[in-house]
Amino acid sequence: MANPKLLIIDDDAGIRAQLKWGLDDFDVITADSRQMAIEQLEFNQPPLVTLDLGLPPDVEGTSEGFAILQAILERAPNTKVVVVSGSDEKINSQKAIKNGAFEFFAKPVDVVQLRLILERAYTDYQSLK
């Protein structure tokens, strides 16, 4: 069986590389913008996504990240999105879950814990098939 596809959306190349390396039991694809994320989502149809909220052009805020979350769930409602962010944890974690994210994971990233969350998300995704 092939590894599950995972789309990592983050504007920080170092974080994308760290997650890709640390989550090698997934078929990782990456994006650093909304346009690239939507293209990768439509082309690869990953069941799993990690999403940083602080993306350009709103690096200091979260509007772009929440817009991407909405776009993902409109196009692929069964996709399990794990928001991975360091922005205003409590407020944004509640907002992310309310808006359809599977889970919120605060930075800095612990890859072992994130892997467990992604495995649980993939199990949940498979149960919807």
Question: Can you describe what each PLM-predicted range is?
Answer:
Residues 13-29:
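Two-component/phosphorelay signaling modules centered on CheY-like receiver
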Residues 30-48, 52-56:
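Acidic, metal-coordinating helix/loop segments flanking the phosphotransfer/catalytic sites
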Residues 39, 60-78:
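Short amphipathic alpha-helix used as the core "switch/output" element in two-component signaling
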Residues 63, 67, 87-103:
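Alpha4 helix (beta4-alpha4-beta5 surface) of REC/receiver domains from two-component response regulators
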Residues 91, 109-118:
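C-terminal output helix
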Residues 119-129:
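The C-terminal output helix
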